[in-house]
Each structure stands twice: as C-alpha cells, then as structure tokens.
Amino acid sequence: MELTELSSLELLRLCEGADCWHTRAVPGLGLHALRMADGPHGLRRQERAGDMLGMNASKRATCFPTAVLTACGWDEALLFEIGAALGREALAEGVGLILGPGANLKRGPLCGRNFEYFSEDPLLTGRLAAAFIRGVQSEGVGACLKHFACNNQEYKRFSSNSVLDSRTLRELYLRGFELAVREGRPAAVMCAYNAVNGEHC
C-alpha cells in the first residue's frame, strides 16, 4: 500500500500514538502497531506506560558508553557495532524503532543532553550518527534520529525559542543532521520541542 492511497483521516491516525511507546495499528490497511524504545546508549523499554519522561518502570538493559565518549575515538566502525548490538537487543525485546541517536551539537555547557550528543563538530556528529543508524538498521530495526533541530536546553524545552541566523543554522546545526540522513538513511527523524526563530519544529 502506498501513502497516496490513504485518506486524510488514515494519514492522521498514523501520526497518533496508542500510548507513549506504541504507534496505533490500522488493521484495515494491514499496518501493525510498532513498539518504540529510547535507545541512544541502551535500550530503555518500559514495563508499562509511565509518565511522559519515562522515569519509571524501565526494564534492565545493556548500557553502552555515551555518545560524547564514543565520539572521542572518531571510530565509525565502533558506532556501527554498537548500533548493531542495540538492534539485536531491540529485536529480542520486540522493539521496532529505537529513538536514537541524538545529533544536536554541543553549543553550551548547560545543555542537559550534552552526554547524548557526539560533538561540537557537525562533520564528526553526522558521520558517527550515520554509522550508528546503519548498525541499528542492519538488524532490521529502525533508528530515529533526534532532536531536529537546535535542541540546546532542557529547561523550558517545550516553550523555548532558539534564535540564530540562517548561515549558522545551515553550516552548523543542520549539517550533522544532513550527513546522518544522507549517509545513514534513518527510518524516522524526531522533531525537537523548541521553536527555531519562532517556528516550532
């Protein structure tokens, strides 16, 4: 079935989750529900629905070194292997989409997710994110590149506005995402909660 064959209501239902960690099935179209799990450093799967931050009820899982640490080696093969290992674990847990890797740049020391991002450099970020994505997807599990774009703070992240000129946006903030998408071809891209120059992602 092609997306062009779906009605507006059917397309809308594809964007609606059954809960925080599952997509909604559309049985009449042969589309099954998809289980998702957070996973930039290890598969964080919920035993049951938790709060929006997922701070409770996580199952035990393998935890790999953070992106900031793995980036120190500039080793794309290592990131591929980490991604593949996470993909295998996801398959064993019935997870079809891993929410990771994170590809934002570290532009300030107070960003609450600096550990989750690879680097200040868009080339290194994009290449390593692409390798991770290819590794995950080599096991038949989708990877979701996040948080597009300019997710630079956790404080009031749902209402913040990242203001920057177009050259900085293109050459720095979007370049890593561009490389990750072109070279990694992720199954999905997660938008950020913040606005960029007044427009929400």
Q: What are the roles of these predicted feature ranges?
A:
Residues 1-201:
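Glycoside hydrolase catalytic-domain context in secreted enzymes
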